[in-house]
Swiss-Prot record:
One Pfam family from the record: DeoC
Record-level GO BP terms: 6-sulfoquinovose(1-) catabolic process; D-tagatose 6-phosphate catabolic process; lactose catabolic process via tagatose-6-phosphate
Protein name per UniProt: Tagatose 1,6-diphosphate aldolase 2
Gene of this entry: lacD2
Organism (species): Streptococcus pyogenes serotype M1
Keywords: Lactose metabolism, Lyase
HAMAP family referenced in this protein's UniProt entry, alphabetically: LacD (MF_00734)
Organism classification: Bacteria, Bacillati, Bacillota, Bacilli, Lactobacillales
SMART domains named in the record: DeoC
UniProt entry tagged with the keyword Amino-acid biosynthesis: no
Pathway(s) it belongs to: Carbohydrate metabolism; D-tagatose 6-phosphate degradation; D-glyceraldehyde 3-phosphate and glycerone phosphate from D-tagatose 6-phosphate: step 2/2
EC number from the UniProt entry: 4.1.2.40
Length: 327
């Protein structure tokens, strides 16, 4: 099935990609970034620090990315120093979730809307949803209605809607556990089927790889839960789960593991359309910025950061498929 885009959405999608491949830099982290910064200093990270680091990353690395994902809370200064060639996605969700309940309900930023995100110069709206396909069905209905609203907003504003799905299990506390690894492919691929339906108005899915590669033979350091063929099947099932373009998030894994995973995904038959890669590219700059200052962080970004993004781009050239084949 080929999906039809409006002229405006197509122009926006072209601005966010290079030759149909989305090689985007993700730096919409807020809570996670504060926790990373707090590991290297005793005082609470300041707004100025967060804005400055985001701006440094944007300025130094967007010349090598097709686009950058930022948040409107701390990322607007960074959006203004990005490369002229790079597109902009803005996150619409509040950071984090209520840890006292298993429902992880979505919530939009209070003073933002799809209209305001478009007015801020973004080519797309990105929204993060936590979803457990096997979870409380009343909660899931609430989540579906919420995504329908955002889809309708984005249709009205004629702006692409990137939906990021992070899966979880209401009964498993640790997503890195072997227990969750055993159900991850089911969680990821079934959630993709749900939100690929036209009623949600999603243009691009930003998703996890369907396997925790740390438990796959040839990738695992310790316990092996999956053969390479079982892992490959999970990627094939993912490809079959949607007609929409989909891109991978790096989920905080190392640059090397993420790149190796993309090669494995492509060899398995996944026709993914790019990445929104965050920490795997810039994580090392946080410690340098806090301990040695902005100039040292800039130097790190020009060397290590560039190396990470350049290597990733080379892998994408070999592995990613253009979204234009689907739309």
């Amino acid at each position: 099935m080929t999906i039809t885009l409006t002229e405006n959405k197509r122009k926006s999608m072209e601005k966010l990609s290079v030759d149909g491949v989305i090689s985007a830099l993700a730096f919409d982290q807020r809570g996670a970034l504060k926790r990373m910064m707090a590991q290297h200093q005793t005082k609470e990270p300041t707004v100025e620090q967060i804005e400055e680091l985001k701006s440094l990353v944007s300025e130094e690395l967007t010349p090598f990315a097709s686009s950058i994902l930022l948040d409107p809370e701390y990322g607007l200064p960074a959006s203004r120093v990005r490369s002229e060639e790079a597109g902009l996605l803005l996150a619409y969700e509040k950071t984090g979730y209520d840890a006292t309940t298993t429902s992880r309900l979505p919530d939009c930023l209070d003073v933002w809307s799809a209209k305001r995100i478009k007015e801020a110069g973004a080519e797309a709206v990105k929204f993060l949803l936590y979803y457990d396909i096997d979870g409380d069905q009343d909660v899931n209905e609430q989540k579906k209605a919420y995504i329908e609203r955002i889809g309708s907003e984005c249709r009205a504003e004629d702006i692409p809607f990137y939906l990021e799905i992070l899966t979880y299990d209401e009964k498993i506390a640790d997503n890195a556990s072997p227990e969750f690894a055993k159900v991850k492919a089911h969680k990821v691929n079934e959630a993709m089927k749900v939100f690929s339906k036209e009623r949600f108005g999603v243009d691009v899915l930003k998703v996890e790889v369907p396997v925790n590669m740390k438990f796959v033979e040839g990738f695992a350091d310790g316990e092996v839960l999956f053969t390479k063929e079982e892992a490959a099947q999970a990627f094939r099932d993912q490809e079959a789960s949607t007609d929409l373009p989909y891109i991978y998030l790096s989920a905080g894994v190392s640059a090397k593991l993420f790149q190796d995973t993309l090669v494995f995904a492509a060899e398995s038959g996944a026709k993914f359309n790019g990445v929104l890669c965050g920490r795997a590219t810039w994580a090392g700059s946080v410690k340098v910025y806090i301990e040695e200052g902005p100039q040292a962080a800039r130097e790190w970004l020009r060397t290590e950061g560039f190396k990470n993004i350049d290597e990733l781009n080379k892998v994408l050239d070999k592995t990613a498929s253009p979204w234009t084949e689907k739309m």
